Amino acid sequence: MASPHAENDMVPEMIDHRHLQMWKWLHSRSGARGNTSETSFESSVSVSTNSFDFSADMSRSIDSSSSRMLPSPITNFVTPSSSFSSHQMHDIYSLAASYLQAPPPPYTPTTAFHPHNAHQLLLLHNMTAAVQTPEDPDIDVVGLADTTNLVSLNDKEDEEKLDQTTESEESDRISISTTEECPLDLTFKPTSLDSPTSSTFIPLRPSVIIDHHIPKPHTSVRRSMSSVSSSASSTQEEVAAHFRRSLSGKWPKRCKVNSEEARNSPLRRRPSFNTHTSVSSLSVHSVSPTPPVTSSAQTIIVNNHCSDTTLSVADHFRRALLGKGLFDFQRKSNK
């Protein structure tokens, strides 16, 4: 029969008490198959005794966490008994209870972790994702992608416009600051002779009536007698119109009229001068005789050309007042 000391020599080192009890129980079972019941009983008793001693020694070094997990000390289950069956059953129950209540041993992987394994797994995942592309893409995803691209393009355009506006504002601010810093130029600058504002030409005062029908000098123009007569008549008409506008109802007041005839004669309307009877009636009631023309009488000159220089200013006013026909008739009768 093997001694307890020989069995203790076969126990591996660095093992906890639960595994030690299991190992001893298995060896006790294997030894009991080859020996008699008496030897097995003695070996079991020796094993139980050794386990009791070892468990008593290990119970002192168990930490608080292990003692909290075990509701009762292991020595209660491994007490030696006289009967073989009861001792064997208590030993099995104690081993099972201690094994189930103990935490599992820490997991130690068989192969060491290599740093390149994570990179290889990520590469494999990317390759499988690239191969398994969806045949029918989602419409919402495509629309969202297009909208995102459009918004990004619009944002880029807005940023470019904002940059341009800021640059223009900065350039305007710089130009304004430079103009404000420059002093005003108050020096007197003589105007050049070629400028239109400094022309020395002083326009002469125009005459009373300007004849636009007289040809310019140094021009060879051949015109018929009808055109010449029409130009002369138009000039005289312009002179007569000018004096008619100048009268404005003041010329009759300056005429010398007999005061007695003016009081006695009734007021009458001005007749027309188209008929012979009106001319004969007006010849009786004519105005005062025309004063003699003196050398100091002013003449009307139109553009230094005048067709009739015998008429004075007073004659022109009389002609405008009486009319052309009556004035010519009175003038002929006076001659």
Swiss-Prot record:
Extent of Low complexity compositional bias: 222-234, 275-295
InterPro entries: TDU_repeat
Disulfide bonds: none
Biased composition regions of type Acidic residues, renumbered to the chain: 156-170
Region called Disordered, residue ranges: 153-174, 218-239, 254-295
SMART domains: TDU (SM00711)
Protein name: Uncharacterized protein R08C7.12
